[in-house]
């Protein structure tokens, strides 16, 4: 009887616990760290493309920022 009540309590907790939400997409996280903005497909003429957020979105940042934040050199992929 104890096993039956234990299973029912565990089942109740599993149904009540909300599912975890995923975090920020890695490309968006890197774009935010570089002080950029994710934009659809194209950056404006005042922006420089510094990366890709996800499919169809590019990471853009103003190229004339008074206090420039260095863009890291991408690491090469090993064959």
From Swiss-Prot:
Cystine crosslinks: 38-53, 43-60
UniProt key word Transmembrane: no
Tissue: Expressed on differentiated macrophage phagocytizing plasmodium falciparum-parasitized erythrocytes.
Organism superkingdom: Eukaryota
GO MF annotations, alphabetized: CCR6 chemokine receptor binding; chemoattractant activity
Stated role: Antimicrobial host-defense peptide. Has an antiplasmodial activity.
Keyword match Disulfide bond: yes
Family: Belongs to the beta-defensin family.
Organism listed in the record: Homo sapiens
Protein name: Beta-defensin 130B
The gene coding this protein: DEFB130B
């Amino acid at each position: 009887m104890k096993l039956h009540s234990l299973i029912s309590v565990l089942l109740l907790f599993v149904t009540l616990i909300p599912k975890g939400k995923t975090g920020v997409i890695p490309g968006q996280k890197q774009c935010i760290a570089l002080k950029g903005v994710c934009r659809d497909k194209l950056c404006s003429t005042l922006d420089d493309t510094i990366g890709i957020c996800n499919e169809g979105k590019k990471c853009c940042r103003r190229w004339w920022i008074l206090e420039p934040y260095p863009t890291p050199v991408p690491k090469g992929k090993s064959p």
